[in-house]
Curated annotation (Swiss-Prot):
PROSITE patterns for the chain: G_PROTEIN_RECEP_F1_1 (PS00237), G_PROTEIN_RECEP_F1_2 (PS50262)
Membrane topology according to the record: Multi-pass membrane protein
Annotated protein name in UniProt: Chemerin-like receptor 1
Gene behind the chain: Cmklr1
GO cellular component, one term: plasma membrane
Residue numbers of Phosphoserine PTMs: 337, 347, 350, 356
Keywords: Cell membrane, Disulfide bond, G-protein coupled receptor, Glycoprotein, Membrane, Phosphoprotein, Receptor, Transducer, Transmembrane, Transmembrane helix
Ranges of the Extracellular topological domain: 1-39, 96-112, 175-222, 281-298
Organism: Mus musculus
Keyword Membrane attributed: yes
């Protein structure tokens, strides 16, 4: 019975969770899987951590100290900070995987680190949704947007996003726990809030049922608020933008449409496997264990990779930068700065023109220097 996994000593015997809360069945996994999975996680997490700290750190520094403060820079700085904090705590989970799922940082850090990771997921998703909605409003209501779109409102919106993410991530502070199993300490979700050494008692079935209900509530809430609803809003916003641009013939170049499609597809591909497998975990007895022992580590790695891809997708691809010769600072500055014109996308042709002017200027500088 699947309820047994929530308050039975069996869960401590054959299931371990990594830093993100999923369980890997080590008894049923093949020796090859047991060896490859930790190595795979260490490599991917390390790569994501390096790229995420570098990319998001660069965005934070340039947008904060090198640029004029605008609504766009507020969005991107908050997004970069959320991803940066996520990557700061990745080394703990790299160590966890490298030590064959042995948690050495204590119960408090088990709760705090996973709370921060969950908080980052919600913050990033909500900020991407806010950015999409902001761009949509700028296209649909350019005059209203110019009159009411302010830095103060952007800060208030970001504050609300962080508070909401805190509330939705709070279950990690309650349910995350540690247990010593066969000489190893695992960090896992103890939804029943029962001690690992507890034995069956008359109220055992009630405790188990309560634990399962909490697991369902947390998983479904995470899927709806952290994926399905944001994806629906983001998709609706960009479809509206595309429809508006095509109807008004404001963009002859199809590059903006390709960027929009790339953003939506990438976000969907990064998080869809993660949430799908977590939903399947609610009925794990009906699914082969190999699906979780191999699928969950892979899905988690793909999901966290989104934190290092955001600087690329939302900054470097944000405008029409077709020439690699353009300086990195210019790319970031142009991407994070406010768009000229009544809305973000109607001025797309000005971006192309501005890029070409920048390139011509750089060529002229070279010619002058050679003379």
């Amino acid at each position: 019975m699947e309820y047994d996994a929530y308050n039975d000593s069996g869960i401590y015997d054959d299931e371990y969770s990594d830093g993100f809360g999923y369980f890997v069945d080590l008894e049923e996994a093949s020796p090859w899987e047991a060896k490859v999975a930790p190595v795979f996680l260490v490599v991917i997490y390390s790569l994501v951590c390096f790229l995420g700290l570098l990319g998001n750190g660069l965005v934070i520094v340039i947008a904060t100290f090198k640029m004029k403060k605008t609504v766009n820079t507020v969005w991107f700085v908050n997004l970069a900070v959320a991803d940066f904090l996520f990557n700061i705590f990745l080394p703990m989970h790299i160590t966890y995987a490298a030590m064959d799922y042995h948690w050495v940082f204590g119960k408090a850090m088990c709760k705090i680190s996973n709370f921060l990771l969950s908080h980052n997921m919600y913050t990033s998703v909500f900020l991407l949704t806010v950015i999409s909605f902001d761009r949509c409003i700028s296209v649909l209501l350019p005059v209203w947007s110019q009159n009411h779109r302010s830095i103060r409102l952007a800060y208030m919106t970001c504050s609300a996003v962080w508070v909401l993410a805190f509330f939705l991530s709070s279950p990690s502070l309650v349910f995350r726990d540690t247990a010593n199993i066969h000489g190893k300490i695992t960090c896992f979700n103890n939804f029943s809030l029962a001690a690992p050494e507890s034995s069956p008692h008359p109220a055992h079935s009630q405790v188990v049922s309560t634990g399962y209900s909490r697991h369902v509530a947390v998983t479904v809430t995470r899927f709806l608020c952290g994926f399905l609803i944001p994806v629906f809003i983001i998709t609706a916003c960009y479809l509206t933008i595309v429809f508006k641009l095509q109807r008004n013939r404001l963009a002859k170049n199809k590059k903006p449409f390709k960027i929009i499609i790339t953003i939506i597809i990438t976000f969907f591909l990064c998080w869809c496997p993660y949430h799908t497998l977590y939903l399947l975990e609610l009925h794990h007895t009906a699914v082969p264990s190999s699906v979780f022992s191999l699928g969950l580590p892979l899905a988690t790695a793909v999901a966290i990779a989104n934190s290092c891809m955001n600087p690329i997708l939302y900054v470097f691809m944000g405008h029409d930068f077709r020439k690699f010769k353009v300086a990195l600072f210019s790319r970031l500055a142009n991407a994070l700065s406010e768009d000229t014109g009544p809305s973000s996308y109607p001025s797309h042709r000005s971006f192309t023109k501005m890029s070409s002017l920048n390139e011509k200027a750089s060529v002229n500088e070279k010619e002058t220097s050679t003379l």
